[in-house]
């Protein structure tokens, strides 16, 4: 089980980490006013990066509120997102959503992103089986 905290190891910190996700995303989840891009990170925990510019959300107070809401939603849903680097890109209109609407929208987006990932169990070769009588 993944710890529920949101420490430094759960964040994308450097431009190189963001660039890796932008250059070759292996998963996408577009929403009405947001885009989630994801890429495998080969770690046992997910990492989150936020891109919320002034063009998308004018007021700093609103940008900070949105970032808090997204981080909290990520923290609560990270068990389903293990092994991914995720970048959230804001679009116009994101600042108009209330906290409840944000939480609901991101709950759906995390689930959509988790479903879009190929199963990790699919790495087992088809000729192998745990059944000795097969």
Swiss-Prot record:
Keywords, sorted A to Z: Endonuclease, Hydrolase, Nuclease, RNA-binding, tRNA processing
EC number in record: 3.1.26.5
Domain of life from the UniProt record: Bacteria
GO molecular function: 3'-tRNA processing endoribonuclease activity; ribonuclease P activity; tRNA binding
Reaction(s) catalysed by this chain's protein: Endonucleolytic cleavage of RNA, removing 5'-extranucleotides from tRNA precursor
InterPro entries: Ribosomal_Su5_D2-typ_SF, Ribsml_uS5_D2-typ_fold_subgr, RNase_P, RNase_P_CS
GO biological process, alphabetically ordered: tRNA 5'-leader removal
PROSITE patterns: RIBONUCLEASE_P
Gene Ontology cellular-component terms listed: ribonuclease P complex
Record carries keyword tRNA processing: yes
SUPFAM superfamilies, sorted: Ribosomal protein S5 domain 2-like
Self-association state and partner proteins as the record states: Consists of a catalytic RNA component (M1 or rnpB) and a protein subunit.
HAMAP family in the record: RNase_P
Family, as annotated: Belongs to the RnpA family.
Function: RNaseP catalyzes the removal of the 5'-leader sequence from pre-tRNA to produce the mature 5'-terminus. It can also cleave other RNA substrates such as 4.5S RNA. The protein component plays an auxiliary but essential role in vivo by binding to the 5'-leader sequence and broadening the substrate specificity of the ribozyme.
Protein name according to UniProt: Ribonuclease P protein component
Organism this protein belongs to: Ectopseudomonas mendocina (strain ymp) (Pseudomonas mendocina)
Name of the gene this protein is made from: rnpA
């Amino acid at each position: 089980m993944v710890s529920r905290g949101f420490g430094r190891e759960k964040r994308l910190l450097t431009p190189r980490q963001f660039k890796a996700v932008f250059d070759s995303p292996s998963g996408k989840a577009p929403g009405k006013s947001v885009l989630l891009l994801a890429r495998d990170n080969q770690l046992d925990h997910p990492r989150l990066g936020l891109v919320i510019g002034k063009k998308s959300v004018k007021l700093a107070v609103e940008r900070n509120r949105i970032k808090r809401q997204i981080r909290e939603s990520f923290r609560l849903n990270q068990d389903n997102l293990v092994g991914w680097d995720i970048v959230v890109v804001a679009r116009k209109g994101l600042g108009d959503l209330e906290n409840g609407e944000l939480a609901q929208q991101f709950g759906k987006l995390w689930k959509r992103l988790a479903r879009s990932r190929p199963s990790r169990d699919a790495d087992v070769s088809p000729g192998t089986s745990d059944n000795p009588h097969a």
